[in-house]
């Protein structure tokens, strides 16, 4: 029994090392592991992947309803747009290091997939684990928090199509809710629906114009854009995989500071199937 337990643990470690250096595990890989074997290995944060030879197609018929389920988005590269010191230069995206590496992927996202009247393919997100709080560390030491999400995503192809294949590219926008919720209190106990209206240490300056942004909390909602480029398709199982690129705003500290653009690049996986009548 001890030998079996040791062998199972060894295989889990090996699988974790292999998947850390590859695109991700397959459904068959994870199907052989238990919760204890996956725990603390980072595998739970990885999206499933398909073989490189998966180059099939999934036909779509007009008038029929389809669903995109088990959609997983795993960001692997993070960039933050920084304003240059020289006004003559343009703002550029600077690579950052993610600090929340085990909790950065979206999973079990689902929605409607259909052919629109103009022949283009459209995906409308309905729910799932569709947000993750992430913090990125910049080279200068600044930490940039943001809420990675695809809430309310509506993405479409630019050209008419009759199938999902390796040339399919879905682009669209989504809503980015506030990083903080209404009951959050900042270090000076100020909040949106609870807490003080101003810093306790300076009550006489509570209405000062330069402190308004910090005192008056707001639930700021932003807009993001994403591109889902399909590169692998298994027509037999309905599985699809590919690369995504998303640009969205960072946290504003409930209106206390200006948001900056955050760019995420990673891999995604999903499954297309007929929708229930």
Curated annotation (Swiss-Prot):
Q: What is its main location?
A: membrane
What is the official name of this protein in its record?
Photosystem II extrinsic protein O
Q: Which GO terms describe its biological process?
A: photosystem II assembly; photosystem II stabilization
Which keywords does the record carry? Manganese, Membrane, Photosynthesis, Photosystem II, Signal, Thylakoid
One Pfam short name: MSP
Q: Please name the source species.
A: Synechococcus elongatus (strain ATCC 33912 / PCC 7942 / FACHB-805)
Which SUPFAM superfamilies does the protein's record reference? OMPA-like
User: What is the membrane topology noted in the UniProt record heading this document?
Assistant: Peripheral membrane protein
Does Repeat show up as a keyword for this record? no
Query: Cellular component terms, GO, for this chain's entry?
Result: photosystem II oxygen evolving complex; plasma membrane-derived thylakoid membrane
- Record's InterPro entries? OMP/PagP_b-brl (IPR011250), PsbO (IPR002628)
Q: Where is the signal peptide?
A: 1-27
């Amino acid at each position: 029994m001890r030998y079996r337990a040791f062998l199972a643990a060894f295989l889990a470690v090996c699988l974790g090392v292999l998947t850390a250096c590859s695109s991700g595990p397959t459904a068959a890989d994870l199907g052989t592991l238990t919760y204890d074997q996956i725990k603390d290995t980072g595998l739970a944060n990885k999206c499933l992947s398909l073989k490189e030879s998966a180059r099939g197609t999934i036909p779509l018929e007009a008038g029929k309803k389809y669903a995109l389920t088990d959609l997983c988005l795993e960001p692997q590269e993070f960039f933050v747009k920084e304003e240059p010191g020289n006004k003559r230069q343009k703002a550029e995206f600077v690579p950052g290091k993610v600090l929340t590496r085990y909790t950065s992927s979206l999973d079990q996202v689902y929605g409607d997939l259909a052919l629109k009247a103009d022949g283009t393919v459209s995906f409308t997100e309905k729910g799932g684990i569709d947000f993750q709080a992430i913090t990125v560390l910049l080279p200068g030491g600044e930490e940039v928090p943001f809420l990675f999400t695809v809430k309310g995503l509506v993405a479409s192809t630019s050209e008419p199509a009759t199938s999902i294949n390796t040339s399919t590219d879905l682009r669209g926008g989504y809503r980015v809710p506030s990083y903080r919720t209404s009951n959050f209190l900042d270090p000076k106990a100020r909040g949106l629906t609870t807490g003080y209206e101003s810093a306790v240490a300076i009550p006489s300056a509570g209405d000062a114009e330069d402190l308004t942004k910090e005192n008056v909390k707001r639930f700021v909602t932003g807009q993001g854009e994403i591109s889902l480029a399909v590169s692998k398709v298994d027509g037999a199982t309905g599985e699809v995989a590919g690369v995504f690129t998303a640009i969205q705003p960072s946290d504003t500290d409930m209106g206390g500071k200006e948001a900056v653009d955050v760019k995420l690049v990673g891999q995604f996986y999903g499954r297309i199937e007929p929708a229930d009548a």
